[in-house]
């Protein structure tokens, strides 16, 4: 899980993510993400802005700063709606938000019959 490195209420809103992490998982500036805060159960959506590469920064801005504060552990997820297969990308990070492992994603389709 990533660690929040900064939390600022007096800002329009967003989450700043180390650009190296963004590149590793294919996040684009302005992309919508879900943020799940492991320390208090809060969940919110916001958009991504890049933080300096190699900084390890995960900063929460705006009203979401009420939900996630410095030191909180978070899971950040992005989704896409498409009729094409998209290979999910997942990484694990250490306490400094540096990638320690790329996780494989194995999905299995479950057929559903409609009457």
Regions found by a protein language model. Name each.
Residues 80-81, 88-107, 112-115:
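Well-ordered alpha/beta subsegment
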Residues 3-84, 92, 96-98:
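Compact, glycine-rich, soluble single-domain proteins
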């Amino acid at each position: 899980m990533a660690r929040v490195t900064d939390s600022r209420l007096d800002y329009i809103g967003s989450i700043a993510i180390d650009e190296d992490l963004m590149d590793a998982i294919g996040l684009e500036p302005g992309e919508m993400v879900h943020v799940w805060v492991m320390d208090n159960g809060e969940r919110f959506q916001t958009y991504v802005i890049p933080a300096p590469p190699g900084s390890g920064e995960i900063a929460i801005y705006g009203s979401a700063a009420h939900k996630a504060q410095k030191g909180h552990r978070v899971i950040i997820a992005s989704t896409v709606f498409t009729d094409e297969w998209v290979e999910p990308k997942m990484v694990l990070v250490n306490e400094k938000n540096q990638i320690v492992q790329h996780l494989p994603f194995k999905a299995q389709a479950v057929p559903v019959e409609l009457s």
